[in-house]
Amino acid sequence: VCGTLMARSKAISGGPVYLSDAPGDFIKENIFPLIDKQGKLFRPEAPAVPMPESILTNPLWSGKAYRVAAPSGNGAMTLICYNLNVSPRHQQVQATIKKEDYSLRNSFEKMSATPEERVLLYNWKSQKAEELSDSSTFELIGFTDKLFHLCPIRKGWAVIGVQEKYLSPSTVQTISLTENRLVLNVLCTGTLKVWIENSGKQELRSISIDTPQKIVIEK
């Protein structure tokens, strides 16, 4: 895996990952976020595809951000925004994520989303979350990428997943969900991130997972 940008691209692609470097050159910080303890890849529910505005663009010369997305677990959609421009004039580009982007889950087989569904926008690197009521705009400086998860907010819960893995939503399975209780099957160790709304308050809760297990979370 060549760098963090390539590692995240491999994660969202849904394809195999080949470690072609010499073993002494492996960077575990880029590899471990792709896999569980047994080396099994966390994969999206379908391979990533370019967002509509990126399909017919040349990401090296467009002067714009290049965006790709894939459906991940628990109704979430994982999205990566890239600045792949090689021209010095476009070392800084602007990217926008809109709530309507989440509705593109409809285009994936057996996936569905409704326009009125509330969506949480989670920035994987900064570990910050906010409800995406309209849109969020940010800068991409240099040859770089930013990884986001768009997670549905249902009954005051949004399941993000294990932070240490690129495809966080793919690391958990929702067993049941009510207004006050959430039951999850967590597939790997790490820090589980869950968005919780209760009595008008919002909380991004971090839960330490020492072993893969079924857990019950109360508001």
Language-model segments: which ranges?
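Short, ordered beta-strand-loop transition motifs
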Residues: W61, A70-G75, I175-R181, S208-T211
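Active-site-proximal substrate-binding groove within the catalytic cores of carbohydrate-active enzymes
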Residues: V1-W157
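C-terminal beta-strand-rich structural cap/linker in extracellular carbohydrate-active enzymes
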Residues: E131-Q173, L192-V194, E203-K219
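Short proline/glycine-enriched turn/loop motifs at strand-loop junctions of beta-rich domains
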Residues: A113-E117, L187-L192, N198-Q202
